[in-house]
């Protein structure tokens, strides 16, 4: 396949050569009369007389044609004769100008067409470069930034990789901090009370074990020690009564403490700090320093109903709708 500019150049060159040959054939006689193609001996007087005679003949012909009405119809032969007659009377400078235009116009056409094609190719290359840069911009986020962008964040906004409650205002934030401080004070009081109850229950269990050991002792003692045993029994009975009173008080105190813990848990649930007690309260585990209350912080999720998810956000990391 040949290139289109080459075909156009060959066509324009052939056309210009054909025009040149035709012009040369039609104006050969006129050039000989004007002296462009000079013979070996030129008679200038004869040439001038011929021109004068020709002009006289032409003037007479025009006068005759003007007097006679044009009764004949227009035909292609008359048109061709008129064009040939007018072309034979043209100046040689007009012929030279026509030849130059026939050579230069095709060349200018090919040059301008080539510049247009290069501009279109440059525009296509610029568009491709812009698309590649946009694709690179879409892929420069890491995992943490993509996770933040999944929850309705725009790229124009600053990316915050740490948690920040966007729905709470500054005044509300101060109020919630005060409530958290008061709730922590209440939880510390309830923990101290539970520790005291646990210590009292441990003392009661220790005394019960001592009484059981006293009851299981052998009965092969002397009769003289019966009085002492009776006195011991009396003292032990008084101790048992005091222990039963302590137990009643201890049972009353956990009820009040359970109410306190309920109130504190309700306050904590309102401020999204729930205390999860599974089953009954294990006092021994509470007395140990390693066992602490498991406080689970549940941040408020921002509900953005107008958020839109694109393909990058959808395929970056799995998330919940």
From Swiss-Prot:
Region of interest (TSC13-binding), ranges: 73-125
Biased composition (Basic and acidic residues): 242-262
Region (Disordered) residue spans: 211-275, 299-321
VAC8-binding: annotated span: 233-321
Low complexity bias (residue ranges): 263-272
Residues annotated as signal peptide: 1-22
Gene Ontology biological process terms, A to Z: lipid metabolic process; nucleus-vacuole junction assembly; piecemeal microautophagy of the nucleus; protein localization
Bilayer topology: Single-pass membrane protein
Region spans: OSH1-binding: 139-195
Entry's localization field: Nucleus outer membrane
Residues passing through the membrane, by range: 94-114
Phosphoserine, modified sites: 156, 199, 285, 298
GO terms under cellular component: membrane; nuclear envelope; nuclear outer membrane; nuclear periphery; nucleus-vacuole junction
Subunit record text: Interacts with OSH1, TSC13 and VAC8.
Function: Involved in the formation of nucleus-vacuole junctions (NVJs) during piecemeal microautophagy of the nucleus (PMN). NVJs are interorganelle interfaces mediated by NVJ1 in the nuclear envelope and VAC8 on the vacuole membrane. Together, NVJ1 and VAC8 form Velcro-like patches through which teardrop-like portions of the nucleus are pinched off into the vacuolar lumen and degraded by the PMN process. Also acts as an outer-nuclear membrane receptor for OSH1 and TSC13.
Domain notes: The extended 80 Angstroms-longloop of NVJ1 specifically binds the highly conserved innergroove formed by the armadillo repeats of VAC8.
Protein name: Nucleus-vacuole junction protein 1
Organism field: Saccharomyces cerevisiae (strain ATCC 204508 / S288c) (Baker's yeast)
């Amino acid at each position: 396949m040949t290139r289109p500019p080459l075909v156009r150049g060959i066509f324009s060159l052939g056309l210009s050569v054909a025009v040149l040959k035709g012009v040369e054939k039609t104006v050969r006689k006129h050039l000989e009369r004007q002296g462009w193609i000079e013979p070996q001996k030129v008679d200038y007087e004869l040439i001038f007389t011929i021109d004068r005679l020709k002009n006289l003949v032409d003037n007479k012909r025009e006068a005759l044609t003007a007097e006679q009405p044009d009764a004949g119809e227009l035909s292609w032969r008359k048109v061709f004769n008129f064009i040939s007659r007018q072309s034979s009377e043209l100046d040689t400078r007009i012929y030279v100008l026509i030849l130059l235009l026939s050579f230069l116009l095709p060349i200018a056409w090919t040059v301008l067409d080539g510049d247009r094609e290069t501009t279109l190719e440059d525009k296509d290359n610029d568009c491709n470069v812009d698309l590649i840069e946009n694709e690179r911009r879409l892929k420069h986020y890491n995992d943490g930034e993509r996770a933040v962008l999944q929850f309705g964040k725009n790229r124009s906004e600053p990316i915050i990789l740490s948690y920040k409650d966007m729905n709470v205002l500054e005044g509300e934030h101060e109020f919630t901090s005060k409530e958290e401080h008061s709730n922590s004070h209440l939880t510390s009081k309830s923990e101290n009370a539970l520790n005291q109850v646990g210590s009292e229950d441990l003392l009661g269990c220790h005394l019960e074990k001592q009484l059981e050991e006293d009851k299981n002792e052998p009965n092969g003692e002397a009769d003289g020690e019966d009085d002492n045993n009776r006195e011991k029994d009396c003292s032990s009975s008084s101790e048992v009564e005091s222990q039963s009173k302590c137990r009643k008080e201890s049972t009353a105190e956990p009820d009040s403490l359970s109410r306190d813990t309920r109130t504190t848990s309700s306050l904590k649930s309102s401020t999204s700090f729930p205390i999860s007690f599974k089953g009954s309260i294990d006092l021994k585990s509470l007395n140990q320093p390693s066992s602490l209350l498991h406080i689970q912080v549940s941040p408020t999720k921002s509900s953005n109903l107008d958020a839109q998810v694109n393909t990058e956000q959808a395929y970056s990391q799995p998330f919940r709708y």
